[in-house]
Amino acid sequence: MTLQPAATKIDADAIRAEFEILTSETVQTGESTDAAPTASNKLPFPVLSDKALFGLAGYVVRKIEPHTEADNAALLIQFLAGFGSLIGKTAYFEVGADKHFTKLNAVIVGASSRARKGTSWSEIERLLIRVDETFRECIQNGLSSGEGLIYHVRDEQTAKKPIKTKGIITEYQDEIVDAGAAEKRAFVIEPEFARVLQSMKREGNTLSSVIRQAWDTDRLRVMTKNPVKATEAHVSIVGHITEIELIRNLDETESANGFANRFNWICARRSKYLPDGGNLAESDLNEAVRCLNEAVQFARNTERIKRDDEANQLWHQVYKRLSDGYGGLLGSVTSRATAQVIRLACLYALLDCSDIIRLEHLEAALAVWQYCEDSAKYIFGVSSGDKVADEIFTALQSSEAGLSKTEISNHFNRNRTAKEIEAALQTLLELNRIEKVEEKTQGRPREVFKVSANEKDEINEISISESQNTGLNSLNSSNSSSNKGN
């Protein structure tokens, strides 16, 4: 006799309730919002302006988007960085004595491992390799030391070999001991960027220093007894990390020493649910491959890039805001805004087969930077980089009436000096987190500090003549319309 399992009654309501809990993040038109603001981060998730999806870059993202759960911003920044690496050390924009080549670093930050950060690279990689099969050998991972990074793009190494005559050394001759790397392009994709940050904490590790060198110049070297060096290096790095891992592993040293501001920080989340995966055929990308081939050939035959008059006018209008930036931790990670925007604009121009940065190229670059800046605010914005300032801000959040300096001192049980409190308040004022208000009294006005009603976003407050609805004001409008559509 065969025993049959007892029939199990399916509780559809219970299953539905459990599913709603698991997918409690708002889902609209098949989209997911993995990265809902946490208790410590009340800023809205960044919105990518349509301005950023200009030209070939936008065409590629829109072609891939229906077939992936990846975030459009992650697709876009990796396409731009990959293109800039693929073309090599050719086109550049000159600022004084400095040349900005098309090297772009980025870190894609997901609220969790479900943000589909890794998925965002696979389709971009497939497209780039179709254009240049040799680029496959340029793609590296496993960053752990500065010497290791240099080794991949190292120069030829020689040693002095003694020449003897009748047993006596009469001269020395250079002998090649290492032919070096013929390929000077390196595109480092790090799906576990937390490991990179952990490696940099080891005593004597040179990775942070070399990464900074690689962004600044084409000459890489470390001061060791038997140094390996590289010239003409063209290195770009893209990392993937979760927000928790980033906050845990990016210490104050790396934020302050210029490591963090050589990266574009990109918030990413799952864009949609595709239970059966995507279905992007090779033929779907044929037109993108053709256009990208043209852009690559053009870029490899281009040297100096310039701005036209219209783009230059907009650049003059946004330059002060980009240069001034922010204070505190947010300022530390976004302080190379001008250089990042220049490189982004160059990439949009080259993708358009132009050696002139036109208005639309600069607008696209500014839209990407706006997203990077908003991402940095979302990730780092609640921390000023000053523990005293952070505690004061928390105290002010709990006091609608605000607090005077005396009350703030009492909050610390007078364990903080007036100088420390003054410096912390100044940091919060610079970040526009708080405002200073004078309240009338019978005698001397009372100075009170309160949380700002609205966070100031100077990048969208730049005054542009009423007759010219361009630049960051129009980018802000585009963002607003995008928000309405979502």
Model-found features: residue ranges?
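Phosphate-handling catalytic cores of nucleic-acid transaction enzymes
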Residues: 3, 10-486
